[in-house]
Amino acid sequence: EIYTLSLHDALPILASLLTNVSDNSILLGYNSYIRSSHLMSAGYTKAIGERGTWALGAQMLDYGKMDETDEQGSVVGSFSAKDLNFQTSYSYMLSDYWSGAITAKVLLSNYANYSSTALGADLALNYFDEAHGFSFSAVGRNLGGQVKSLYDDGVKESMPFDLAFGLSTDFANAPLRVSLTADDVTHWDDVKFIQHFVLGMDILPSSNTWVALGYNFRRAHEMKVADKSNWAGFSIGAGLNVKKFKVGVAYGNYHVAASSFLINAGFSL
């Protein structure tokens, strides 16, 4: 449950599942990203009546310090770069099987002496049949655009709108769940067909533990070196639930020289 809250910032498909998150929950997350980049997040959820759930979240992606150079490439100083995301989500159970969600977000970027502001929204719809362990989701991501341009000419850009779909199913006789996500559907012809998909598998040895494996076909293709993938595109994670406290860790390989480590901790008040 707590991982739905932590992941819905990166995968808005999961925002429609917030109705399954524990009431009055707090989550903190940290992700050591490529090289000196770091992603930090915090979130809170609260049940609204019998069918609604409200969530509030914030994320900061800090790219660290970088060398500032002149036209000849000589280092003349350093600068930092950050992205901030503040968002609120509301999820509602439309029926026993269907739920929907909307997320509104404010995005702030600061790169050296340049800054920008954008307003955006995500829409999500989920069908979940608990008796058969089947789920289907659809999302429209990044509706909106800049209200303050990053550039001196004042040109404002739209956010990169995207459609994504996902489905998952449990196995009646095995502690497994498999999932398939189709991403970047609005740019279907930009890459090969298979590169739009992400495969996932959850291993559920008990009600309090889980292990997850994932494979991103596009990342594996784009990050391979000399026709060798070096495990690019693979990710692995695990989690433990102990009463009101939940913790999860994950590792993803982006490139032979770049990987990512994520840790979440959540507590139900």
Identify the residue ranges that each predicted region occupies.
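Short, exposed "boundary/linker" segments that immediately precede the start
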Residues: 1-5
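Subset of outer-membrane beta-barrel
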Residues: 6-269
